[in-house]
Amino acid sequence: MAVYVVTGKLGAGKTLVAVSRIQRTLAKGGIVATNLNLKLHHFPQVGRYAKQCRVMRIADKPTLEDLEAIGRGNLSYDESKNGLIVLDECGTWFNSRNWSDKSRQPVIDWFLHARKLGWDVIFIIQDISLMDKQAREALAEHVVYCRRLDKLNIPIIGGLISVLSGGRLPLPKVHFGIVKYGDNPQSLTVDKWIYTGTDLYAAYDTKQIFTSDRELSPPFCPVSPYYTHGIFAVKRDAKYYMRMTKIYFKKMNRVWLMASFLALGAGVGFFYKSRQINEQLSNMPVASAQANTTKTDHTIDELPRLSINSFAQMGYDVNVSFKDAKGKIYYSFDLMKSGYALDIKDSCHITLRKRNYIQQVTCEG
């Protein structure tokens, strides 16, 4: 059996972490007794279609009769199936000033035997010192210290941003729960709860006011979410999505119709334009283009009448220079770069080739 005393300043997320534990207990089929006003259909892991959601709403400031009325939380010996009791604002009725009341001692005796009755207990209080010493030493097995990340400031960096922007460094709203084994802040840390809980904000009344008037907060058992919300909810099946699609289509039909006509007109225009371009390309005089290309190639490939001006060979390297009738010199490596092939028979007989062009070059010219 685990007893947690959840502590923290105002707005630190004490109730939020307790509600998350309530959700976990309900999700695995356990029983919950609490003085919180819960909205069961807003629990994400429970949902509005849950038919067996066992929750007991006890008085804001429960007495021994209220605790005895909830019965047992677990009939088996498996403590993982224990029920959960969550009591908020314990500082108003679980403190040393009210503990002199004779009706308080039977309450602490009941909580001492809660394990045998199959209950885990969570007390929510702003500070552990507000709880009576006798109850604190007897019941405070674990103490949870809640902190909020967005209320902290990063040293140095936070100060620089505050000076430059005139505001605090915005940090995410993340809640930390540091679980200590015992009521001493220096006790061993046994666990750390890190959570955001944004999906649980709507699951309980954050503005609930606790009162000692039992007529304003009588015990009762809330009805399962299925019978209050699920039975009236619209089933989101294939018919639902088809119906929603038709509704949105009717709202947007004019816009869709206009966009469809624009797209159709653009598509037809591109189609006819591409056909015109293809017809123009197919009607071009292919023969004349080939003739012009051949003529141009021959013109480029043809060389003036050449003669061998010099011939030098060192091993496999041959360097030849040619000369035309005007005395212009042509070097063999330049001709080879231009695509000409040199067929050397001897120093006075060389053949130049490029495509269909052939010229026999000799020493005499």
Swiss-Prot record:
Keyword Transmembrane helix in annotation: yes
Molecular function GO terms recorded: ATP binding
Swiss-Prot/TrEMBL GO biological process terms: viral extrusion
Assigned GO CC terms: host cell membrane; membrane
Membrane topology listed for this record: Single-pass membrane protein
Keywords annotated in UniProt: ATP-binding, Host membrane, Membrane, Nucleotide-binding, Transmembrane, Transmembrane helix, Viral extrusion, Viral release from host cell
InterPro entries recorded: P-loop_NTPase, Zot_N
Localization in the cell: Host membrane
Entry binding sites for ATP: G8, K9, L10, G11, A12, G13, K14, T15
Primary subcellular site in the record, as a coarse category: host cell
Membrane-spanning intervals of the chain: 255-272
Function per UniProt: Isoform G1P plays an essential role in phage assembly. It is required to increase the number of adhesion zones between the inner and outer membranes of the host cell. The extrusion of neo-synthesized phages occurs at these adhesion sites. May be involved with G4P in creating zone through which the phage assembled and extruded. Isoform G11P is also involved in phage assembly, probably playing a structural role in the formation of the phage assembly site.
Subunit note: Interacts with G4P; this interaction results in a complex that spans the inner an outer host membranes.
UniProt family annotation: Belongs to the inovirus G1P protein family.
Protein's name in the database: Gene 1 protein
Organism whose genome encodes this protein: Enterobacteria phage I2-2 (Bacteriophage I2-2)
Gene: I
